[in-house]
Amino acid sequence: MKKPIYYLPGHGGVLQKGLGAALLARGHEVMGRETVGEFNRLPFGQQVEVIAQDLTAHFTQSDAQVIANSFGAYLFMHAQAQMQPFAGRVLLLSPIVGEFGSDELQRKTHLNFIPPRADLLYELAKKGTYPIPQNAEFHVGSEDWQSNPENVLALAQMWGVQSHMVPGSGHAIDRGYITQLLDRWLT
């Protein structure tokens, strides 16, 4: 089995389905936290602390890998905020980076979401105090209403890391794109 990957799925996600299943099929051991059950019932701050402890205990090497999706990426970024810069590689897919929604979106869909500590990532990035992972990249769909592409690209620019907008994709980035991305990223 290949080196383990620390995987954080989106809200309600489990490690052996979706992207986790794709990683397992490629021969990787998948570790991380499922965003369901007992872990999901923890307060946000405790979730962040558990992830930070996991990473500090088992994923400190320069060849360590983290893949986080949607709200899992939000959890990772908050855990990273209280750690030394992650030494390995980080792949953030459709990352929640703070509040999403707008007056227009609210009128059309009645949807708006403000996650816990919604402003923290931008505040730390603006101050230059966020402990930026040494090798990170962001991928977001151009039509993603949850991970506002403009906000994702702005945060990636503040961090000085790679960012990619996937044309025509929503929050669930096109499977073909993800397959090609994993082919490149995991080699």
Indicate where each model-derived feature is located.
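Gly/Ala-rich beta-loop-alpha elbow adjacent to hydrolase catalytic centers
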Residues: 67-77
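Active-site nucleophile elbow and catalytic-triad environment of alpha/beta-hydrolase enzymes
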Residues: 110-129
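Short glycine-rich catalytic loops that host catalytic nucleophiles or stabilize transition states
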Residues: 33-37, 164-170
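Active-site nucleophile loop of the alpha/beta-hydrolase fold
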Residues: 35-38, 91-100
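Catalytic histidine-centered segment of alpha/beta-hydrolase-like enzymes
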Residues: 41-43, 169-179
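Conserved alpha/beta-hydrolase "acid-adjacent" motif
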Residues: 16-17, 145-151, 174
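Active-site catalytic motif of lipid deacylating hydrolases and related acyltransferases
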Residues: 2-60
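Short beta-strand/loop motif that positions the catalytic acidic residue
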Residues: 132-133, 137-140, 144, 152
